[in-house]
Curated annotation (Swiss-Prot):
Keyword Metal-binding: yes
Function: Probably acts as a heme chaperone, transferring heme to an unknown acceptor. Binds one molecule of heme per monomer, possibly covalently. Binds 1 [4Fe-4S] cluster. The cluster is coordinated with 3 cysteines and an exchangeable S-adenosyl-L-methionine.
Organism: Bacillus subtilis (strain 168)
Knockout consequences: Cells lacking this gene accumulate coproporphyrinogen-III under anaerobic conditions, but show normal growth under aerobic and anaerobic conditions.
Compartment(s) where it occurs, according to its Swiss-Prot or TrEMBL record: Cytoplasm
Residues that hold S-adenosyl-L-methionine 1 according to the record: Y5, G60, E94
Keywords: 4Fe-4S, Chaperone, Cytoplasm, Heme, Iron, Iron-sulfur, Metal-binding, S-adenosyl-L-methionine
The protein's name: Heme chaperone HemW
InterPro entries in alphabetical order: Aldolase_TIM, Coproporphyrinogen-III_oxidase, Elp3/MiaA/NifB-like_rSAM, HemN_C, HemW-like, rSAM
Length: 379
């Protein structure tokens, strides 16, 4: 096992678009949660053996919503239990610009964290307020500069497009401002309105006014062209990086490789079995105490399912799915398994089917879901 994801489900506030497993941190049993999280790690490793991890990613929620003492407790626990060695190439933490003090940054740096992912979303203060964010544009500059001063040389900025009230001009301003910071990595996602969110409730009432689909496609084109013009290469549908600064942890997912998933609501992929942990914090703590593991669901992945996942995850990468690696992994030819699908998608101009790989065309990136769905139920 080369990768571990750790979920911290606490936030100081809830964003209007977020459907991740998260809770207001006030009145939550945070220390009990951290104790249960440590126990889950210990119990899992007792079963699988000590891993030689290459990547660790702490997400949420908002990991940096923890107090300085709690953040240090988390870092100490990870280093004590997971025992990352010099082979660990990426130790990443998601952070909010408004709660990232110099002291918290020092705690992360001293613990071995070498990559930060800032939830920026937009550099328009009025849009930030509309989507339920509490930070301002100036907070991003302050936190970014502070992180640089403390020695972080790998910073990613998360941005969004297709937001309510967002214009092409807004987006261009946000992308230009983000690029002016000269970060190593940029994730730029289109808004997807998910159930159980503030935006979903507004949409149900006819009160959410989003850019039309054609404009959203134009926004994505702007993102791609500006990144390319700035020398930031696209390596996945929504991700852009300087050479060599791609997210190694996320490439684990897109390459359909296995990983630990620790914490409330976390997903894991261990020994050919996909696991989903319970989401509610109290339920998670109780299950760890009673059973040692917090699984809500486990599913042994069939070979057919693995192959489907290989295609719809792998095609998210600009490099696509390697035919050589596919054959080594599954003992079968990619062209032999999907002859009609590959022919149809190539004729529609959505994929390139070369001798070595299958990958999306420019048009395929715009219609990715159509491409991914074509491989489902074909085996």
């Amino acid at each position: 096992m080369k990768s571990a994801y750790i979920h911290i489900p606490f936030c100081e506030h809830i964003c209007h678009y977020c459907d991740f497993n998260k809770y207001f941190i006030q009145s939550q049993p945070v220390d009990e949660y951290l104790n249960a999280l440590e126990q889950e790690m210990i119990n899992t490793i007792a079963k699988t053996g000590q891993p030689d991890l290459k990547t660790i990613f702490i997400g949420g929620g908002t990991p940096t919503s923890l107090s300085e003492e709690q953040l240090k407790k988390l870092m100490d626990m990870i280093n004590r239990v997971l025992k990352p060695s010099s082979d660990l190439s990426e130790f990443a933490v998601e952070a909010n610009p408004d709660d990232l003090s110099a002291e918290k940054l020092k705690i992360l740096k001293e613990a071995g964290v070498n990559r930060l992912s800032f939830g920026v979303q937009t550099f328009e203060d009025d849009l930030l307020e509309k989507i339920g964010r509490v930070h301002k544009q100036k907070d991003v500059f302050t936190s970014f500069e502070r992180a640089r001063e403390i020695g972080f040389e790998n910073i990613s900025l998360d941005l969004m497009f297709g937001l309510p009230g967002q214009t092409l001009k807004h987006l261009e301003h946000s992308i230009n401002t983000a690029l002016s910071l000269d970060a190593e990595h940029y994730s730029v996602y289109s808004l997807i309105v998910e159930p159980k969110t503030v935006f979903y409730n507004l949409m149900q009432k006819g009160r959410l006014h989003l850019p039309p689909q054609e404009q959203e496609a134009e926004m994505y084109e702007i993102v791609m062209s500006k990144m390319e013009a700035h020398g930031i290469h696209q390596y996945e549908i929504s991700n852009f990086a300087k050479a060599g600064m791609e997210s190694k942890h996320n490439l684990t997912y897109w390459s359909n490789e296995q990983y630990f998933g620790f914490g409330a609501g976390a997903h894991g992929y261990i020994g050919g079995t996909r696991t989903v942990n319970v989401g509610p914090v109290k339920h998670y703590i109780d299950l760890i105490a009673e059973k040692g593991f917090p699984y809500r669901d486990t599913h042994e992945v069939t070979t057919e399912e693995q192959i489907e996942e290989e295609m719809f995850l792998g095609l998210r990468k600009t490099a696509g799915v390697s035919k050589k690696r596919f054959a080594e992994k599954y003992g079968r030819s990619l062209d032999g398994l999907f002859p009609s699908v590959l022919k149809d998608l190539a004729e529609k101009g959505l994929i390139h089917n070369s001798e070595s790989a299958v990958y999306l065309t420019h048009q395929g990136k715009l219609l990715g879901n159509e491409v991914f769905g074509a491989f489902l139920g074909e085996l």
